[in-house]
Amino acid sequence: MRGTVKWFNAEKGFGFIKYNDLEDIFVHYSAILKDGYKTLKEGDIVDFKLIETSKGLQAQEVTEVQLTTI
């Protein structure tokens, strides 16, 4: 799935992703697949796996999409 980061609080380590008309999807820093400091910025486009937990929708295996222009 592909969505857009609505907001992410680096100090608290979590935020939310917007995907189509679904409710906001929770994302925790531990679900971000990248080396180094795991954070996201508002407006980042990300690919992720969606799971449903007792607390609602949650993103897993989150990766930033690198867009290229020609």
Where do the model's predicted regions map?
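OB-fold/S1-family single-stranded nucleic acid-binding modules
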Residues: 51-70
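S1/OB-fold single-stranded RNA-binding interface
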Residues: 2-31, 36, 61
